[in-house]
């Protein structure tokens, strides 16, 4: 198939008739003036002629009897009769039409006809006798030809181009035979298509035999016909492989042939003007003279924007496409029709959502291309800015009241169905935090418009067309509704993006947000926001202000969030709940609302308990703002952690419960939205005291000893860390506890610098209890940067706050997931001590010390009692939550200070050994203060715990290497189990396979062994796959791939694992190189002589044993000696002791006689 030879195949009716291939039955005459051209093409198209001319010959003569006889006819061949010997080439007298199915050469004028025969030829194959066709040719569907045709250069209308022999459509001639009367239609199509510019055959036309039959049969005379295109079609009839590719689109074209009979045929009869067709091509926005392969896609894309939108214009475009693009129009138009059908449900769903969500349609009209999200909001700005004056404040309020009520009723009426539709097209409506200049708003309806613009960004063409179907009244209503809802704020369409691009461009980017939108559309929990509105309305419906209450709650959100936004943006979103809201727009407030009743002891603490699961970006939710209230709905680890904290502060809670339960009684009766409003109110207070950050920056110089001390405490008693963190993160739930925490922090800081912190702590005591969490976040920063790098204190405050807020969110989640494990580590002291610094738990062990170094040193001692009570119960849950900690910790380190990451990791690796040397000045002070605050019970326990746990860290500092110890300890259990045959099956498999491999290497080369093993594995897997396939076919079950579980399992080697082993191996390699250098360069003569003696002994060993033999012996010894030693340890130790004693005695005698050795020994 000469796809590359398209240029040589371009011919007209006059200058390139086919060369005479060996004729079998008929004698054909070629045009004398074109014999030179035929000779040029003889080598390339010899095989093509055989099949293509056969097609022409087999046509019945009745249909073409009226055709005028051309002066010179192109040669025709017939392969249907193999018994006829081939006739000599060259001009031959015309053969009489003996057979009815054969076509006399005098009835066809191949040279004079247009090369655009393939449409006619397409009709013929279905009518050809099937026995004449080669057996390998299956009937080929006509559909895929435009897609599979090789690209041909555009040709002028005057010089139509021949189809390449590689065209897929040529297989269409292998279709089964049918009745004769179709021949006139083919001839007529040949006549009419002669002057079409894009003469690559249209698969669509090839599939219209019945349509063409009516129109073509009525024509009295036929124009001269050319065999050029038939030549290629007949040739490719053999290509069954090509035919298989068209099977998928055959039904599409058949459908097109049924739907558009008149449009597909009449244009070919009536339109012959090439110039007009070229003009129509340009109008339709696609070059139909271009490559047939690309035309279908181009036509679908371009006509989709013109055809789908206007139904009345679709008919005209279909006609024009079918008329002036005979090759492509049927297939592509059918595709357009089908795409329109496919898009119609999405259109209706989108329109339904727009009616329900009151989204501005014009925004999606203009924003129809893939651009960053900022473009969408800018487009909205242009719309909203011009319409800011349209609505007055009172009208806005009343309309929003009405709309909220209607939306709630509509949401209730539609139920799950409407919610599921919302999930497909846009996010649920949720109150969002938006900023307009100095004012901040939280609106419920603006987010749907934002998400719909996002949807327009994802599906530009679809959104573009659906919006055009709307009437002007709907557009006006939707625009007004959105203007009213957004309160004339141009940025309210997507405040999250605005805020993100304003203040946190490095934290959440538009790429992430595109993922957010797609992921949330798929995974959004159903019914949260509708429930929010429904319950708000239902709870207040009995009162006269039913809809007004729902709106007022929103206004409450709006008003209370103004100060929040003003403080959030400069401080880089230090409030985790709102930062989560920006990262994951939809789930945040629903989670707040759902969690608020559970944590109603302090309304401001239930912000984001269930957020990590709902967060598409997987940003860990902060625990610092979560409440401690122990509810069965909370996650089990969280319950247990809360139970720990509750056990600790039983005595404290007796004092605090009256106040907190009063708050709970008030909050529980309020609707969810009001609780959420109160949550936001409380969080506003927590974001305000930014001056304290500068306060901690001032006392940074006093804190260098404090982090060290706390690191020491972490080393000595790991269990204190999570409790310490949790005391700051979750105890804020109880107001008294928070005030006590403030007192504790105040006292501990006063010990360091009384004058600096006195004024600040007065502010903290007067502020809301929730405020404690914020200073905690801020207080974390100086310690972190001091321990990291002294120069980091010079970083601007805003920058530090941004990184701290992000890092603390993730870090708190890490602590939240690992609190139980950390609190239970006292029982597993030896195990946890063996963990090196690369372990996730180790990171958390080290890291909280930076967090709580300044203000939490007393609290970690006061909370030791908590961990003592709960460590037994939490061992299991803590161990289970170990894997969860890896990701948050890694995220926190990568996101918080990427520049200093290496430095921090080094600091972690060395902290165990370095921190223990710090003098214990502050531990006593903080223990004393904790005694003052918490009671007499705490001090003895703290001091005792400190005394007990200080020694292990002192002794372990020498044993801690970077990661060698970790790798050894992590793999120690599995290796020991293997060597000691704990699991006989597992050990047997490993030992047997290793021994078999080594024994095989003794017989075969390593290449042969590898090849044999691979073949054996392949034979097993292939046989099993075939066996399972047969079983499934017999049982008619659909179990899928038998190895699907293994194929989908994660086999990638983690970077941490590689680093761990590489670091361990690097240490061994370096030590070996140093030792060898010392031995070979005779740093010590005695050691070099010993090494020489060892090598001399190895010469005899090598003469007796091969290397593989030694490896086999070593393997056998490795799996046998440990078991033998375990069973006979006492006897072996006795004899080994005797042997060692004798060896030492012998060495002592030798050293006594040799002065150099004696000196070395001394």
Curated annotation (Swiss-Prot):
GO biological process, one term: regulation of cell migration
InterPro entries per the UniProt record, alphabetical: Reticulon, RTN1-4
Positions carrying N-acetylmethionine: 1
Positions bearing Phosphoserine: 7, 16, 105, 145, 165, 167, 329, 344, 426, 489, 690, 727, 768, 832, 857, 961
Lumenal face of the membrane: 1010-1078
Signal peptide: none
The keyword Nucleotide-binding is assigned to this record: no
Gene3D superfamilies: 1.20.5.2480
Residue ranges, compositional bias (Basic and acidic residues): 408-422
Protein name per UniProt: Reticulon-4
Species name: Mus musculus
Gene name in the database record: Rtn4
């Amino acid at each position: 198939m000469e796809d590359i030879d398209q240029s040589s195949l371009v011919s007209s009716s006059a200058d390139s008739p086919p060369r005479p291939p060996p004729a079998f039955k008929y004698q054909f005459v070629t045009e004398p003036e074109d014999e030179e051209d035929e000779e040029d093409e003889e080598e390339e198209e010899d095989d093509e002629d055989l099949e293509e001319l056969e097609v022409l010959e087999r046509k019945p003569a009745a249909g073409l009897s009226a055709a005028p006889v051309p002066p010179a006819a192109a040669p025709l061949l017939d392969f249907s009769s193999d018994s006829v010997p081939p006739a000599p080439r060259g001009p031959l007298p015309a053969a009489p039409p003996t057979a009815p199915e054969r076509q006399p050469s005098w009835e066809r004028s191949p040279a004079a006809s247009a090369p655009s025969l393939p449409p006619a030829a397409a009709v013929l194959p279905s009518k050809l006798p099937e026995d004449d066709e080669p057996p390998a040719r299956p009937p080929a569907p006509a559909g895929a030809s435009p897609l599979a045709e090789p690209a041909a250069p555009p040709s002028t209308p005057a010089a139509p181009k021949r189809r390449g022999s590689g065209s897929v459509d040529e297989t269409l001639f292998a279709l089964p035979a049918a009745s004769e009367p179709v021949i006139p239609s083919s001839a007529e199509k040949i006549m009419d298509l002669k002057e079409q510019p894009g003469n690559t055959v249209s698969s669509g036309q090839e599939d219209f035999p019945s349509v063409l039959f009516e129109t073509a049969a009525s024509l009295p005379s036929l124009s001269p016909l050319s065999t050029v295109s038939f030549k290629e079609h007949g040739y490719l009839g053999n290509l069954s492989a090509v035919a298989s590719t068209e099977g998928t689109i055959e039904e599409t074209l058949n459908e097109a042939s049924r739907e558009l009979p008149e449009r597909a045929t009449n244009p070919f009869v009536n339109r012959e003007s090439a110039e007009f067709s070229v003009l129509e091509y340009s109008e339709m926005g696609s070059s139909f003279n271009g490559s047939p392969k690309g035309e279908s896609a181009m036509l679908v894309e371009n006509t989709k924007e013109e055809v789908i939108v206007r139904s009345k214009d679709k008919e005209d475009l279909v006609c024009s496409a079918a008329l002036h693009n005979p090759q492509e129009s049927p297939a592509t138009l059918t595709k357009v029709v089908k795409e329109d059908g496919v898009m119609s449900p999405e259109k209706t769903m989108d329109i339904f959502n727009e009616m329900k969500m009151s989204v501005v349609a014009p925004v999606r009209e203009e924003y129809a291309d893939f651009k960053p999200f900022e473009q969408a909001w800018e487009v909205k700005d242009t719309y909203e800015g011009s319409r800011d004056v349209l609505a007055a404040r009172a009208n806005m309020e009343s309309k929003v009241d009405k709309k909220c009520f209607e939306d709630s009723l509509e949401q209730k009426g539609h139920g799950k169905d409407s919610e599921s539709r919302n999930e497909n097209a846009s996010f649920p409506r949720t109150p969002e935090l938006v900023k307009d200049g100095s004012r901040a708003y939280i609106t419920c309806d603006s987010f749907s418009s934002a998400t719909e613009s996002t949807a327009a960004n994802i599906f530009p063409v679809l959104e573009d067309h659906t919006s055009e179907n709307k009437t002007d009244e709907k557009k006006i209503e939707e625009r007004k509704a959105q203007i009213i809802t957004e309160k004339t704020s141009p940025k309210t369409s997507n405040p999250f993006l605005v805020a993100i691009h304003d203040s946190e461009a490095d934290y959440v980017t538009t790429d992430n947000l595109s993922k957010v939108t797609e992921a949330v559309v798929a995974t959004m929990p159903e019914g949260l926001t509708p429930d929010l509105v429904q319950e708000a309305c239902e709870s207040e419906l009995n009162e006269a202000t039913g809809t007004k209450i729902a709106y007022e709650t929103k206004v409450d959100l709006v008003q209370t969030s103004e100060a929040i936004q003003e403080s959030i943006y400069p401080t880089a979103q230090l409030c985790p709940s709102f930062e989560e809201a920006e990262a994951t727009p939809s789930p945040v407030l629903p989670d707040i609302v759902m969690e608020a009743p559970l944590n109603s002891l302090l309304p401001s603490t239930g912000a984001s308990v269930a957020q990590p699961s709902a967060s598409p970006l997987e940003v860990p939710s902060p625990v610092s703002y979560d409440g401690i209230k122990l509810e069965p709905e909370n996650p089990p680890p969280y319950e247990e952690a809360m139970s720990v904290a509750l056990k600790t502060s039983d005595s404290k809670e007796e004092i605090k419960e009256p106040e907190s339960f009063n708050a709970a009684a008030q909050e529980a009766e309020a609707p969810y939205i009001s609780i959420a409003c109160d949550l936001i109110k409380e969080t506003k207070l927590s974001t305000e005291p930014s001056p304290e950050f500068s306060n901690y920056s001032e006392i940074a110089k006093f804190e260098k000893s404090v982090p060290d001390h706390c690191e020491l405490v972490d080393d000595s008693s790991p269990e204190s860390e999570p409790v310490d963190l949790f005391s700051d993160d979750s105890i804020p739930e109880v107001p008294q506890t928070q005030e006590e925490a403030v007192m504790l922090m105040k006292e501990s800081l006063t010990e360091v610098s009384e004058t600096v912190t006195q004024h600040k702590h007065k502010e903290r005591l007067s502020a809301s209890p929730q405020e404690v969490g914020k200073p905690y976040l801020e207080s974390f920063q100086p310690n972190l940067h001091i321990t990291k790098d002294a120069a980091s204190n010079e970083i601007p405050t805003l920058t530090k706050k941004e990184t701290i807020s992000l890092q603390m969110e993730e870090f708190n989640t890490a602590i939240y997931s690992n609190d139980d494990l950390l609190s239970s580590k006292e029982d597993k002291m030896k195990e946890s001590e063996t963990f090196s610094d690369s372990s996730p738990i180790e990171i958390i062990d080290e890291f909280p010390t930076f967090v709580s170094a300044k203000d939490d040193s007393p609290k970690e001692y006061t909370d030791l009692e908590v961990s003592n009570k709960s460590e037994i119960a939490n061992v299991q849950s803590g161990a289970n939550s170990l894997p969860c900690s890896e990701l948050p910790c890694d995220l926190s380190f990568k996101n918080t200070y990427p520049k200093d990451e290496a430095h921090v990791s080094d600091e972690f690796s060395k902290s165990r050994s370095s921190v223990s040397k710090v003098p214990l000045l502050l531990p006593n002070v903080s223990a004393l203060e904790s005694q003052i605050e918490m009671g007499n019970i705490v001090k003895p326990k703290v001091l005792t715990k400190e005394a007990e746990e200080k020694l292990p860290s002192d002794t372990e500092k020498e044993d801690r290497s970077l990661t060698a110890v970790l790798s050894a300890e992590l793999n120690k259990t599995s290796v020991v189990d293997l060597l000691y045959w704990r699991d006989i099956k597992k050990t047997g498999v490993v030992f047997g396979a290793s021994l078999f491999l080594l024994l095989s290497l003794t017989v075969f080369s390593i290449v042969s062994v590898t090849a044999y093993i691979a073949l054996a594995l392949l034979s097993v897997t292939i046989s099993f796959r075939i066996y399972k396939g047969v079983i499934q076919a017999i049982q008619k079950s659909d179990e899928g791939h038998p190895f699907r579980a293994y194929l989908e399992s994660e086999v990638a080697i983690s970077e941490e694992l590689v680093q761990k082993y590489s670091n361990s191996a690097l240490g061994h390699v370096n030590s070996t190189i140093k030792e060898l250098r010392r031995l070979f360069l005779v740093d010590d003569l005695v050691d070099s002589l010993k090494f020489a003696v060892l090598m001399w002994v190895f010469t005899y060993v090598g003469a007796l044993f091969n290397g593989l033999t030694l490896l086999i012996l070593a393997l056998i010894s490795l799996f046998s000696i440990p078991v033998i030693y375990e069973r006979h340890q006492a006897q072996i130790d006795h004899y080994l002791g005797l042997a060692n004693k004798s060896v030492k005695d012998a060495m002592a005698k030798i050293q006594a006689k040799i002065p150099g050795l004696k000196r070395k020994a001394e």
